[in-house]
C-alpha cells in the first residue's frame, strides 16, 4: 500500500493549520486532501508521524502522547488497528493486536513490578486463553474473562503449591485438584477459594479422607483410611475436627 503512494502524484505543501487552531499538519497532499506521509502536531504536544489516507492516520505510524507514552504500529481510520507497540513512559508496554484503539487479539503486556500477561484480548480486556506471571515466580495459565481468572486454569504459587481446576472471578470455584510440595493432595470441590463439597484428601504417609467439607474444613460424614492398620473407618467431623468414628468411642 505504501508503494502505491508513489504513483499518486502527491505534493508537499506549506504547514497547514486547521481552522480550530488546535493542530498543524505538514506533509504530502493529494489534490486538497491530506494523503501520504506527514506529521500532525497538536497544541498539547501530541504528535503523529506516519501515513494518512483521506486525512486520517492509516497504514503505519507513530503517535507521541503529551504524557510521554507512544504507540507505534498499524492504523486505520485514525485508530490503532492491526499490530502495534504501546510503550508507557514508565516502561510498561503492550505489544500485540489492536482493533479500534483497543487491545484485541493476541498480545503481551508487562507492568513496572515485573508482572506480565501473554494471551488473548477482547475489547481491551484479557479474555480467552493466556498466561499471567508474577515477579515472585507465581503463574496462572488458563482462561480469562473480563481480566479475571474464569473457567479452566492452573495456578502455581512461588512455593510450588499448585491448583488445577475451575475458576470464577479470580477465585477457585468448582471442581479442582490442589497439590502441596510435601505430597498432600486435595481432589474435590471449591467455593469462593475454600474447600466445600465432596472431596478426597491424600496425605504423603498414605492416609486418605473421603467426605464432605464446608467453609474450608472437614464437616459432616466421611471415610478415613488408616494405612498403619490397613482399614477404612466411617466417622463424623465438625469444623475440621473428628468427633467420632461410628461403632467406636469418641476419638
PLM segments and residue spans:
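Intrinsically disordered, low-complexity repeat tracts enriched in Gly/Pro/Ser/Thr and acidic residues
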Residues: 1-251
Amino acid at each position: 500500500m505504501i508503494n502505491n503512494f508513489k504513483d499518486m502524484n502527491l505534493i508537499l505543501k506549506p504547514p497547514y493549520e486547521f481552522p480550530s487552531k488546535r493542530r498543524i499538519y505538514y506533509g504530502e497532499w493529494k489534490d486538497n486532501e491530506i494523503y501520504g506521509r506527514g506529521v500532525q502536531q497538536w497544541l498539547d504536544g501530541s504528535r503523529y508521524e506516519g501515513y494518512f489516507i483521506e486525512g486520517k492516520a492509516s497504514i503505519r505510524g507513530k503517535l507521541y502522547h503529551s504524557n510521554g507514552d507512544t504507540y507505534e504500529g498499524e492504523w486505520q481510520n485514525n485508530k490503532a488497528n492491526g499490530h502495534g507497540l504501546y510503550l508507557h513512559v514508565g516502561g510498561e508496554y503492550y505489544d500485540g493486536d489492536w482493533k479500534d484503539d483497543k487491545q484485541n487479539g493476541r498480545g503481551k503486556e508487562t507492568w513496572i513490578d515485573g508482572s506480565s500477561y501473554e494471551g488473548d484480548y477482547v475489547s481491551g480486556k484479557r479474555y480467552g486463553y493466556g498466561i499471567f506471571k508474577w515477579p515472585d515466580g507465581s503463574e496462572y495459565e488458563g482462561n480469562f474473562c473480563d481480566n479475571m481468572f474464569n473457567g479452566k486454569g492452573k495456578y502455581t504459587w512461588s512455593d510450588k503449591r499448585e491448583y488445577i481446576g475451575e475458576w470464577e472471578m479470580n477465585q477457585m470455584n468448582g471442581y479442582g485438584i490442589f497439590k502441596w510440595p510435601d505430597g498432600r493432595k486435595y481432589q474435590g470441590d471449591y467455593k469462593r477459594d475454600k474447600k466445600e463439597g465432596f472431596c478426597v484428601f491424600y496425605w504423603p504417609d498414605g492416609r486418605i479422607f473421603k467426605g464432605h467439607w464446608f467453609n474450608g474444613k472437614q464437616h459432616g460424614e466421611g471415610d478415613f483410611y488408616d494405612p498403619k492398620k490397613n482399614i477404612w473407618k466411617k466417622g463424623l467431623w465438625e469444623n475440621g475436627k473428628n468427633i467420632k468414628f461410628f461403632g467406636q468411642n469418641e476419638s
